[in-house]
Every structure is written in C-alpha cells, then in structure tokens.
C-alpha cells in the first residue's frame, strides 16, 4: 500500500493527533479539524523526510472541499497515531503549483 493510502486510512479511522505546534498554528491560520480531514481525499505526498530528527515524516498537499490548498507535515503511519506536526496554507510565491519549492 502506498504511503499516502496508509496515512489516509489512519486519518479516516480517527487515528491521528495534533502536536502542540500544529494546534497553535491551526488557530493562528484558521484551519479547522474538518478542513484537515477533508484534504486527505485527494492528497499527495510532495516531500518525504525519512531521516527527520523526530522520526520519519512527510509533507502532504491536499485541498479542502472549498478548494483551499493546505500543506500538512505528519509522521509516517508506522506510529499507532499519526502525528500532525504542522499545517499551513502554502504561499504561491514560495511554491510552484503548491507542489515544488521555488528556488532563488
């Protein structure tokens, strides 16, 4: 099973939690839990961080039902609960099609 499919399966089963940082950022950036769930429907892994210092994680791009693009960094599904590390609306000045980081 693909990484995104395993993550999606855990999200749908409510097997996820937010880091304190993600909770703080969701309040500041006005991203609610429902939007977080919605974006996994057509989500894709755009960056992979297998050697992340706190454990393997990846950056996911998805869109809410309203079409709002969001990035979520989360742990691999090998954990009992997926940890949502951070989430934000990507800046189009920093991303090409919200998928590829622009270089200077």
PLM regions: where:
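Ribonuclease/tRNase effector modules and their secretory precursors
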Residues: 1-104
């Amino acid at each position: 099973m693909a990484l995104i499919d395993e993550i999606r399966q855990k999200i749908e089963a409510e097997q996820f939690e937010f880091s304190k940082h993600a909770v703080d950022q969701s309040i500041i950036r006005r991203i609610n839990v429902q939007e977080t769930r919605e974006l996994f429907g057509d989500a894709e892994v755009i960056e992979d961080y297998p050697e992340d210092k706190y454990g393997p994680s990846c950056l996911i791009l998805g869109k809410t039902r309203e079409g709002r693009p969001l990035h979520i960094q989360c742990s691999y599904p090998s954990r009992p609960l997926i940890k949502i590390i951070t989430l934000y609306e990507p800046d189009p000045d920093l991303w090409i099609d919200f998928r590829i980081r622009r270089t200077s």
